[in-house]
């Protein structure tokens, strides 16, 4: 039987913070964690962590283009969230 390695505590906390109460948003945020976060530059990781402190309606507005940001790292995170893995 294969044993799973214990999860990195920081990654576990980030995954937990990706749980928003909207399945679609959960899937997008968790997809970013699984596919992009580890390889992202520190400024992009910081932008993602900041995004997780943003209220859901504002995240949705950013994702749909109804709200724009002039933060280039946050813009890049939004772009990556909308990409298919």
Regions found by a protein language model. Give the residues of each.
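Positively charged, polar, low-complexity stretches
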Residues: 2-85
